[in-house]
UniProtKB/Swiss-Prot annotation:
Region (Necessary for nuclear localization): 93-166
GO biological process: 3'-UTR-mediated mRNA destabilization; 3'-UTR-mediated mRNA stabilization; cellular response to epidermal growth factor stimulus; cellular response to fibroblast growth factor stimulus; cellular response to glucocorticoid stimulus; cellular response to granulocyte macrophage colony-stimulating factor stimulus; cellular response to lipopolysaccharide; cellular response to tumor necrosis factor
Protein name: mRNA decay activator protein ZFP36
Positions carrying Phosphoserine: 58, 64, 86, 88, 91, 167, 184, 195, 216, 227, 274, 294, 321
Gene Ontology CC, one term: cytoplasm
Source organism of this protein record: Bos taurus
InterPro entries for this protein: ZFP36-like, Znf_CCCH, Znf_CCCH_sf
SUPFAM superfamilies linked: CCCH zinc finger
Placement of P-P-P-P-G repeats on the sequence: 69-73, 196-200, 218-222
Length: 324
C-alpha cells in the first residue's frame, strides 16, 4: 500500500490533527514573519540604513519609534512614551550645575590678551561686570598665615584664606591678629601669641630678671619672649627697661650703672633661701622646683627688699624629707 494513501486516510480519521497542524503552521509562519526572525531582520536593515544615511544603527534603535511585538511565549509589554518627548541630558535646555566659585575670579587670559577661547562658557569673569561676590567664611582673611610669616611663602598664594599682606586685612578694628601653632622654646605648648608683641616687652634688660641657682644657664634675651614661664609675674610693681616719669620713684633715682649692673648684685629667688640647711634636701628639692629653671619677675629689684615668700615645693618632696 502506498504511504501517501495511508497518510491521507489518517488525516481523514482524526479531526483534531488538522487543527493542530494549522496552529503549528501559523506559529511557524509568525516566527518566520515576526520581528525576531533572521529573515525579517535582514530585510529591515537596508530600510533603516536608507532612512538614516551615514549613521550606524542597531536593530533595537531602528524599531524604537514603533511598537515591537513580544517574542513567542511572553506577554506584550506596556507601551512607553516616545524618546522624542523625554529630555536629553545633553540638550541645551538642561540647566548645568554651577560651582560656588563661578565667575568669582577674573580670567587671566582675558585680562592679559583681551580674548578667551572659551568665550561665554568660561568659568571666570571677563571684566568687572561679570565678577560675582563669593560667599566666604566669617573668619576669612582675619588671621595671619602661619606658613607665610614663618617660611616666607605659602603654597596657596592669593587663594589662601589667611592674611599675607596688610591690605588683605578684613578683621574688625580692635581685635589683634592671631598666629596659629605658635612655637615655644621651652618644650611646652604655649597658647596663641599676639603679633606684634607689646612695646613694653620688646627689649627686656638684664637687670629686670632674677635667676635662681639651677643646673642650666639662663636663656638668651631672644628666647625669653617665647617662653611661657617668662610672663609669670610675681606680686609687685613691674618696671620697664627705660625709666619714665610715670614709673616708680626708685627707677628715677637709679643711675645707668645700677640699671645695667652685674647679674651677681641682683636679688635671688626666694626659693633659694627658703630651703632647709640639709644638703641632701637641697639637692632633692632644687631639681624639683618648677619655676627655678626659667627666669621670673622678681619684686623688689629696684625698691626695698621684700620678705621671703613661702617655699615652692611639691607635697611629695615634703613627705620624703620628713620620712628621712
Amino acid at each position: 500500500m502506498d504511504l501517501a494513501a495511508i497518510y491521507k486516510s489518517l488525516l481523514s480519521l482524526s479531526p483534531e490533527l488538522p487543527s493542530d497542524l494549522g496552529e503549528t503552521e501559523s506559529s511557524t509562519s509568525w516566527a518566520s514573519s515576526g520581528p525576531w526572525s533572521l529573515s525579517s531582520s535582514d530585510s529591515s536593515l537596508p530600510e533603516v540604513a536608507a532612512r538614516l544615511p551615514g549613521r550606524s544603527t542597531s536593530l533595537v534603535e531602528g524599531r524604537s519609534c514603533g511598537w515591537v511585538p513580544p517574542p513567542p511565549g511572553f506577554a506584550p509589554l506596556a507601551p512607553r512614551p516616545s524618546s522624542d518627548w523625554s529630555p536629553s541630558p545633553t540638550s541645551p535646555t538642561a540647566t548645568p550645575t554651577t560651582s560656588s566659585r563661578y565667575k568669582t575670579e577674573l580670567c587671566r587670559t582675558f585680562s592679559e590678551s583681551g580674548r578667551c577661547r572659551y568665550g561665554a562658557k568660561c568659568q571666570f569673569a571677563h571684566g568687572l561686570g561679570e565678577l560675582r561676590q563669593a560667599s566666604r567664611h566669617p573668619k576669612y582673611k582675619t588671621e595671619l598665615c602661619h606658613k607665610f610669616y614663618l617660611q616666607g611663602r605659602c603654597p596657596y598664594g592669593s587663594r589662601c584664606h589667611f592674611i599675607h599682606n596688610p591690605s588683605e586685612d578684613l578683621a574688625a578694628p580692635g581685635h589683634p591678629h592671631v598666629l596659629r601653632q605658635s612655637i615655644s622654646f621651652s618644650g611646652l605648648p604655649s597658647g596663641r601669641r599676639t603679633s606684634p608683641p607689646p612695646a613694653s616687652l620688646a627689649g627686656p634688660s638684664v637687670s629686670s630678671w632674677s635667676f635662681s641657682p639651677s643646673s642650666s644657664p639662663p636663656p638668651p634675651p631672644g628666647d625669653l619672649l617665647l617662653s611661657p614661664s617668662a610672663f609669670s609675674a610675681a606680686p609687685g610693681h613691674l618696671c620697664r627697661r627705660d625709666p619714665t616719669p610715670a614709673c616708680c620713684p626708685s627707677c628715677r633715682r637709679a643711675t645707668p650703672n645700677s640699671v645695667w649692673g652685674p647679674v651677681g648684685g641682683l636679688a635671688r629667688s626666694p626659693s633659694a633661701h627658703s630651703l632647709g640647711s640639709d644638703p641632701d634636701e637641697y639637692a632633692s628639692s632644687g631639681t624639683s622646683l618648677g619655676g627655678s629653671d626659667s627666669p621670673v619677675f622678681e619684686a623688689g629689684v629696684f625698691g626695698p627688699p621684700q620678705p621671703p615668700a613661702a617655699p615652692r615645693r611639691l607635697p611629695i618632696f615634703n613627705r620624703i624629707s620628713v620620712s628621712e
